């Protein structure tokens, strides 16, 4: 019993204003929505979808070097490819972003390495 969208649109186009009003009321009752709320929901849906899509890339932020700064510098050098001075400056300047635009799995792995080295970090 599949009805094509074109058939539905054609039926609606042939309705009078009174019939359209009754159709809208029946749809509101059947689906438990109001016409005004449906407009807002449609406008908000693309923004929500965009927010979900953006969460495919994560950033790991070093919040504190901790007590064992040497180990933290070693981990930062290993994962970023920075030189000793650059890695030390990054660790000393916490909070700083260590890596950004990485997958959730990579971010979790990097966070684990930094925490094991004694650093404080978070994923955003």
From Swiss-Prot:
Keywords: Ribonucleoprotein, Ribosomal protein. Pfam families: Ribosomal_L12, Ribosomal_L12_N. GO terms for biological process: translation. It comes from the Bacteria. GO terms for cellular component: cytosolic large ribosomal subunit. GO terms for molecular function: mRNA binding; structural constituent of ribosome. Forms part of the ribosomal stalk which helps the ribosome interact with GTP-bound translation factors. Is thus essential for accurate translation. Belongs to the bacterial ribosomal protein bL12 family. Homodimer. Part of the ribosomal stalk of the 50S ribosomal subunit. Forms a multimeric L10(L12)X complex, where L10 forms an elongated spine to which 2 to 4 L12 dimers bind in a sequential fashion. Binds GTP-bound translation factors. This is Large ribosomal subunit protein bL12. It comes from Nitrosomonas europaea (strain ATCC 19718 / CIP 103999 / KCTC 2705 / NBRC 14298). The gene is rplL.
């Amino acid at each position: 019993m599949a009805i094509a969208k074109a058939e539905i649109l054609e039926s609606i186009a042939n309705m009078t204003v009174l019939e359209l009003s009754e159709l809208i009321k029946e749809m509101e009752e059947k689906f438990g929505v109001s016409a005004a709320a449906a407009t807002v929901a449609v406008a908000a849906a693309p923004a929500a979808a965009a927010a979900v899509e953006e969460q495919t890339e994560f950033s790991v932020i070093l919040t504190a070097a901790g007590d064992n700064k040497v180990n933290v510098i070693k981990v930062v050098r290993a994962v970023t490819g920075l030189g000793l001075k650059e890695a030390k400056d990054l660790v000393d300047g916490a909070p700083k972003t260590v890596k950004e635009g990485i997958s959730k799995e990579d971010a979790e792995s990097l966070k684990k390495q930094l925490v094991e080295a004694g650093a404080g970090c978070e994923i955003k």
